[in-house]
């Protein structure tokens, strides 16, 4: 196995074998994003030169994602960097948190919803406010991420109540495919239908931009988001597993 570090998303021909990853249309996008926020990316190749794995890593947040079907490659990348948690499509015997990948065919499905709240799309002028909200939602977040995401074309949809952001959610759009992610509603504004409105706003935006397909990774521990996705006729089509350093090092079940 040969492993090389990427200095640019475009400095290497990232041609992946068929069936390599559900996220294949997004892999080059993910590499670009992680490098622009100060992270690292590595690619492994098997004998013959075919790509066998991809690893992206954010030093600030101490998290990584391994894209591979090989346990050998998975184990190698797990030991490459210190991390608090790591995502992978590969299921192992090690305890993990399961995320279901919900998807929807936007070409052949109508999106109909009655909104309860006004939805806005954030712009660069709201960058500082969005950054502060993202830190509230994810205290360990790499603060470079918000600026990079907006620069690269991600859209942030917000709902305001009482003069402040009550909730927001992000959407990426790559190669005709939408990724719905990073929803957060402040606790005091939950159960008001904000999350549902933000989901439908993103689906409608994608459909208006002729997206063929959309997906979202949702933890099985997040019952409200799973219910909202199901109500929007999104259906599970795959899984991602979140591993924690303690479990991988000890190879024991995670104690919650």
Task: Indicate residue ranges for each PLM-predicted region.
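Conserved active-site alpha-helix within GNAT-family acetyltransferase domains
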Residues: 76, 89-97, 196, 220-238
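Conserved acetyl-CoA pyrophosphate-binding loop and the N-cap/start of the following alpha-helix
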Residues: 189, 193-201
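A conserved beta-strand-loop-helix scaffold within acyl/acetyltransferase catalytic domains
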Residues: 57-59, 138-187
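Short amphipathic alpha-helix that is part of the acyltransferase structural core
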Residues: 1-27, 108-141, 255-256
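Acyl-donor-binding surface of acyltransferase catalytic domains
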Residues: 48-117, 240-247
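N-terminal charged segments
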Residues: 1-82, 139
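Conserved hydrophobic beta-strand within the GNAT/NAT acetyltransferase core sheet
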Residues: 180, 214-218
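Glycine-rich acetyl-CoA-binding "A-motif" of GNAT/NAT acetyltransferases
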Residues: 50-51, 164-167, 224
């Amino acid at each position: 196995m040969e492993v090389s570090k990427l200095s640019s998303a475009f400095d290497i021909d990232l041609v992946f074998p068929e069936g390599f990853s559900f996220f294949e249309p997004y892999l080059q996008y993910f590499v670009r994003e992680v490098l622009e926020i100060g992270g690292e990316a590595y690619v492994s190749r098997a004998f013959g030169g075919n790509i066998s794995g991809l690893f992206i890593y954010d030093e600030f947040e101490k998290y990584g994602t391994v894209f591979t079907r090989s346990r050998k490659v998975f184990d190698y990348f797990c030991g490459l960097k210190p991390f608090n948690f790591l995502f992978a499509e590969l299921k192992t015997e090690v305890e993990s948190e399961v995320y279901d990948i919900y998807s929807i065919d936007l070409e052949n499905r109508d999106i109909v919803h009655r909104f309860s709240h006004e939805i806005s799309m954030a712009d660069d002028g709201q960058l500082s406010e969005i950054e502060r909200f993202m830190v509230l939602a994810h205290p360990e977040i790499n603060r470079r991420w918000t600026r990079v995401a907006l620069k690269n074309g991600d859209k942030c949809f917000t709902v305001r109540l009482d003069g402040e952001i009550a909730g927001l959610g992000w959407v990426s759009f790559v190669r005709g495919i939408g990724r719905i992610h990073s929803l957060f509603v402040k606790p005091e504004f939950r159960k008001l239908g904000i999350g549902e409105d933000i989901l439908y706003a993103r689906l409608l935006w994608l459909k208006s931009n002729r997206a063929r397909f959309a997906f979202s990774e949702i933890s099985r521990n997040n019952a409200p988001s799973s219910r909202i996705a199901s109500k929007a006729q999104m259906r599970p089509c795959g899984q991602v597993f979140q591993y924690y350093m303690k479990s991988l090092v000890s190879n024991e079940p995670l104690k919650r």
